């Protein structure tokens, strides 16, 4: 039985590693690649927004070491190497969490069962520097749990790890609340005489904490990190005092039941397990899980750490509950429940793994090409389209990676200038004055996505450009559109390359279809499909898209409901595909 338990847990870890080692599809990867290349080629640290039209704006490149590692990996194996790096970081995170659970005395079946919540963090499984924070968070937990049980000097390893972390990602500030949870928890337990930690080991923990805080000095951006630490309470899109530059970062929003119900379910499960396993309850565990829950409620991006805490901390509570129940069974029946529990844990793990597996598969490395303006960038470069460039927010990184220094992008995912961000948002949203912003920055070429990546809605800017006689569409593919100012190119060139406006809807439709194939919850993409299909009198496909839109939209849409009532008698049953 023990061999089977270990085999199943090893297989579960391998599945996590395989699903994590998949295609690169995150937009931020490319400004990080470009930053890494620039720093290696110039042997300098980035301090201003070099790659955008706000080139003089200060830039806090907190992940500078990650950028260099990312670019170095790319030079070795291209985008395939980046996929492998992503898998190694996430696989390493899971392994460190399991090791922490084992140090705490967890059984193999309990570890397998509580590995399932690891899948709930998959919203953060992108090739970003936050993966280093995932890994180092898990390693910190492992070392702290080892110190709680063994004492010694091993806890001083947190100091070099902190120096590494502080240069890889700004998430290093999380080291402070992690250590605070253990210091408060173990300090309280010592006062109550319920701690296994000696007074000397507790003093060592304080010394290690002091060294970790000293680690904030070992970075080119010490001042910026300290400011980040003391302004953490202002983080979060929509929060009072939060920077406008967080507006489009969905994971910077406060967590709600509507956008992440599993987080709330996980908190309930955690409370129940800790109550049932009260014999193993410790003040440090309460401080840690309570703190992680508060962090998760504050920001959606922090929910992952609560799920990680479940993997490392909760297995012993499952064991405590199981031991209580098993003690009431006769000896000859005890092996059967353990075997059933192991198989049940495996089934639960598979249940949580399936959505990610169906989306990403196993070990599919490389680049999700349709997600990026690959051919559009080549078109801009090959035809030397006139500067300056405007781009939609999430494509700034890729365009900087491929077009700098010939072109500076308008903005990218690391835009730290609130003024520039405001300008970019006004244009992208088609707000009044959008054209004056383009004139202010001398924009002659626009490279735009068709649909937003979060909901799938088409960009309002496209409607403005379609109606404006000063702009012409000159390139379109499955997700990219390129427009130029008519008066900025020659008439002969424009006559050869101008495309009809109908191609805009072609691109909106094709990208919306791709978006729902990878994530069907993008409800606005279903609406875009329905809208274009209805305009083209493709009514069966339109009805199918309308049905999916109405099923997923968070608010009632009377217009869509009316269209559905009109089309249903004409078509009958909805078409089986959009």
Predicted regions and their residues:
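Juxtamembrane membrane-water interface segments that cap and precede transmembrane helices
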Residues: 60-72, 227-265
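Membrane-interface transmembrane helices that cradle and orient dolichyl/undecaprenyl
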Residues: 140-155, 271-277
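C-terminal luminal/periplasmic domains and tails of membrane-associated envelope-modifying transferases
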Residues: 357-394, 404-408, 415-578
């Amino acid at each position: 039985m023990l061999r089977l338990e270990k085999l199943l847990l090893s297989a579960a870890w391998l599945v996590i590693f395989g699903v994590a080692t998949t295609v690169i599809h995150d937009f931020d990867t490319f400004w990080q690649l470009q930053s890494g290349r620039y720093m290696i080629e110039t042997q300098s640290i980035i301090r201003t927004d070099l790659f955008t039209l706000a080139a003089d704006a200060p830039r806090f490149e907190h992940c500078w070491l990650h950028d260099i590692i990312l670019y170095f990996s790319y030079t070795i194996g291209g985008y395939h190497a980046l996929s492998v790096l992503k898998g190694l970081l996430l696989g390493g995170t899971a392994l460190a969490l399991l090791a922490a659970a084992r140090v705490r005395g967890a059984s193999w079946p309990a570890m397998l069962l509580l590995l399932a919540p690891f899948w709930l963090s998959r919203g953060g499984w992108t090739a970003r520097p936050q993966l280093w924070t995932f890994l180092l968070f898990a390693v910190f937990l492992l070392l702290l749990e080892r110190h709680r049980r063994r004492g010694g000097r091993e806890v001083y390893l947190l100091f070099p790890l902190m120096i590494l972390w502080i240069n890889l990602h700004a998430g290093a500030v999380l080291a402070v609340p992690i250590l605070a949870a253990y210091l408060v928890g173990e300090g309280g337990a010592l006062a109550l005489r319920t701690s296994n930690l000696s007074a000397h080991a507790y003093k060592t923990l304080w010394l290690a904490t002091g060294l970790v805080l000293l680690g904030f000095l070992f970075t080119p951006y010490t001042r910026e990190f300290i400011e980040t630490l003391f302004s953490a309470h202002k983080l979060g899109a929509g929060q009072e005092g939060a920077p406008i530059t967080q507006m489009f970062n969905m994971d910077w929003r406060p967590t709600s039941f509507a956008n992440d119900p599993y987080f709330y379910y996980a908190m309930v499960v955690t409370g129940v397990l800790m109550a049932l396993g009260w014999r193993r309850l410790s003040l440090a565990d309460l401080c840690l899980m309570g703190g992680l829950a508060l962090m998760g409620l504050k920001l959606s991006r922090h929910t992952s750490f609560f799920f990680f805490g479940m993997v490392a901390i909760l297995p012993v509570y499952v064991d405590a509950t199981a031991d209580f129940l098993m003690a009431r069974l006769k000896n000859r029946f005890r092996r059967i429940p353990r075997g059933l529990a192991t198989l049940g844990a495996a089934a639960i793990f598979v249940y949580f793994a399936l959505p990610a597996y169906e989306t990403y598969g196993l070990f599919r490395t490389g680049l999700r090409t349709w997600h990026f303006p690959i051919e559009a960038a080549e078109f801009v470069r090959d035809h030397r389209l006139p500067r300056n460039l405007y781009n939609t927010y999430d494509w700034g990184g890729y365009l900087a990676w491929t077009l700098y220094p010939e072109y500076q992008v308008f903005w990218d995912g690391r835009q730290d200038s609130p003024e520039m961000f405001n300008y970019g948002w006004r244009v992208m949203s088609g707000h009044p004055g959008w054209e004056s912003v383009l004139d202010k920055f001398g924009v002659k070429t626009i490279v735009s996505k068709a649909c937003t990546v979060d909901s799938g809605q088409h960009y309002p800017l496209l409607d403005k450009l379609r109606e404006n006689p000063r702009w012409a569409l000159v390139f379109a593919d499955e997700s990219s559109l390129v427009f130029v100012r008519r008066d900025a190119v020659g008439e002969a060139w424009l006559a050869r390359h101008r495309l009809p406006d109908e191609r805009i809807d072609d691109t909106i439709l094709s990208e919306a279809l791709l978006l729902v194939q990878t994530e069907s919850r993008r409800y606005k993409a279903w609406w875009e499909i329905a809208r274009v299909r209805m305009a083209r009198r493709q009514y069966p496909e339109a009805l199918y898209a309308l049905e999916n839109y109405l099923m997923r939209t968070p608010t009632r849409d009377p217009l869509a409901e009316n269209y559905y009532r009109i089309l249903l008698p004409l078509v009958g049953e909805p078409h089986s595909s959009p």
